[in-house]
């Protein structure tokens, strides 16, 4: 290993411009725009709206607003939108996250203008029809909410956010079973969310100048308005326990201020996912799982970034609750060990893994939650933030770990609660 490290420079090539993340940001007709050109025949156009569950006035409103996308507008029926896009070979999709609603069109680059006009039309001229709420939007949202509630791990992570942040980022993303927002609530929220200062347009694939010009042409009619506001995120903690007969989970959550390069590197150092197929990996959490339970349970770390906060999570899962309890204790011990005396090689490896994972999020033609959040953030999407990975040191990692451990973590236990631990038992 030492000889490999010494000879590593032989394998390195000169660093090139990071085209995968190099979006060109600008303001066009009051709209925030960012674009990159790629040597592909297809591209995408996304509208990233700051209207996720963090900003909603009542539970479920953001989810229903997202489901109204690509329904009837002032110019086209929902059927016409569907048929026209199918004839052009396009794909229309929507996502909702804790901070954003993302409307995306993927298409052959030659049809860029059609989709730029369609997305602007959806934002500016959606008709919120009562019958569509009753017959299409509500049923679709309820099905998606049911699927969410059937996924025990997703429910556990939602509970972890609730305990770590309480309100705002901690709000429930999907429509609660008992909620039924009115059409007037949705229309009122849309009128405040669909304004120029509250969304960004992201182009990936087509000619950047052409995409920018079309954005200026079609999005210019949208009202200016003021961005939606949310109270600053408050970091909290707590424990939640849910009985379940299925797979057991124990989730640890360490809330922190806005994501830093150190937090991304820390997440990679903890790891848990194997970098080589059919292996357990050599990260701290992989070793913890092997030591504590001979891999009868697994432990995986992940960092979820938001605009003014982030959540470092460690998820321990398996069928044996005793193995999970032992692995949770060993994983917590592994995290505490990083508060001092971290070997340089561990940090170098963590930096490389963190950069690979972070930059890979920008490679797909369509946006995901991480790339969307970073692109609309002036700090996390910049070259300065990316170069910050190379400045991470053992001392800076230790400082972050000490800060995370200064207050109790949030925990969620799902499964056999007679065996799964409490935080103070780790």
Swiss-Prot record:
Gene Ontology MF terms in the entry: metal ion binding; structural molecule activity
Keywords recorded for this protein, A-Z: Electron transport, Membrane, Mitochondrion, Mitochondrion inner membrane, Respiratory chain, Transit peptide, Transport
Keyword Membrane included in the entry's annotation: yes
Gene Ontology biological process: mitochondrial electron transport, ubiquinol to cytochrome c; proton transmembrane transport
Superkingdom of this protein's organism: Eukaryota
One cellular-component annotation, GO: mitochondrion
Pfam families assigned: Peptidase_M16 (PF00675), Peptidase_M16_C (PF05193)
Membrane disposition: Peripheral membrane protein
Annotated compartments: Mitochondrion inner membrane
Main location (coarse class): mitochondrion
Residues annotated as transit peptide in the record: 1-30
Family as reported in the entry's similarity comment: Belongs to the peptidase M16 family. UQCRC2/QCR2 subfamily.
Complexes and interactors: Component of the ubiquinol-cytochrome c oxidoreductase (cytochrome b-c1 complex, complex III, CIII), a multisubunit enzyme composed of 3 respiratory subunits cytochrome b, cytochrome c1 and Rieske protein, 2 core protein subunits, and additional low-molecular weight protein subunits. The complex exists as an obligatory dimer and forms supercomplexes (SCs) in the inner mitochondrial membrane with cytochrome c oxidase (complex IV, CIV).
Function of the protein: Component of the ubiquinol-cytochrome c oxidoreductase, a multisubunit transmembrane complex that is part of the mitochondrial electron transport chain which drives oxidative phosphorylation.
Name this protein carries in UniProt: Cytochrome b-c1 complex subunit 2, mitochondrial
Organism: Schizosaccharomyces pombe (strain 972 / ATCC 24843) (Fission yeast)
């Amino acid at each position: 290993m030492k000889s490999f490290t010494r000879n590593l420079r032989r394998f390195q090539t000169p660093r090139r411009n990071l085209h995968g993340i190099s979006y060109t940001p600008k303001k066009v007709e009051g709209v925030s725009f960012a674009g990159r050109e790629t040597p592909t025949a297809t591209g995408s156009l996304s509208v990233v709206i700051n209207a996720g569950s963090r900003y909603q006035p009542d539970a479920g409103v953001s989810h229903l607003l997202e489901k109204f996308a690509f329904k009837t507008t002032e110019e086209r029926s929902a059927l016409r939108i569907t048929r026209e896009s199918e004839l052009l070979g396009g794909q229309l999709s929507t996502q909702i996250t804790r901070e954003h609603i993302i409307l995306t069109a993927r298409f052959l680059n030659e049809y860029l203008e059609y989709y730029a006009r369609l997305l602007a039309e959806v934002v500016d001229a959606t008709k919120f029809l009562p019958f569509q709420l009753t017959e299409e939007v509500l049923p679709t949202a309820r099905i998606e909410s049911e699927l969410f509630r059937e996924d025990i791990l997703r429910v556990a992570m939602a509970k972890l956010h609730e305990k770590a942040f309480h309100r705002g980022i901690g709000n429930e993303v999907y429509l609660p079973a008992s909620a039924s927002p009115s059409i007037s609530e949705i229309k009122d929220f849309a009128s405040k969310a669909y304004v120029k200062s509250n969304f960004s347009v992201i182009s990936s694939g087509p000619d950047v100048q052409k995409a920018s010009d079309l954005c200026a042409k079609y999005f210019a009619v949208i009202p200016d308005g003021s961005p939606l506001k949310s109270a600053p995120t408050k970091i909290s903690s707590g424990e939640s326990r849910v009985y379940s007969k299925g797979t057991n989970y124990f989730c640890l959550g360490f809330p922190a201020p806005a994501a830093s390069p150190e937090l991304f590197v820390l997440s990679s150092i903890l790891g848990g996912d194997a970098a080589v197929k059919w292996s357990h990996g050599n990260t701290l959490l992989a070793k913890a799982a092997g030591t504590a339970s001979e891999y009868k349970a697994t432990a995986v770390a992940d960092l979820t970034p938001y605009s003014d906060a982030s959540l470092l999570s460690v998820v321990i899962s398996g069928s044996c609750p005793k193995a999970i309890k032992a692995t949770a204790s060993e994983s917590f011990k592994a995290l505490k060990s990083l508060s001092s005396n971290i070997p340089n090689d561990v940090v170098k490896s963590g930096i490389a893994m963190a950069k690979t994972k972070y930059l890979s999020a920008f490679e797909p033609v369509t946006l995901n939650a991480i790339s969307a959040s970073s692109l609309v953030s002036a700090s996390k999407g910049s070259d300065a933030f990316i170069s910050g990975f190379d400045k991470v040191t053992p001392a800076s990692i230790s400082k972050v770990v000490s800060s995370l451990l200064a207050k109790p973590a949030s925990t969620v236990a799902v499964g056999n609660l007679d065996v799964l631990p409490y935080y103070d038992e780790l």
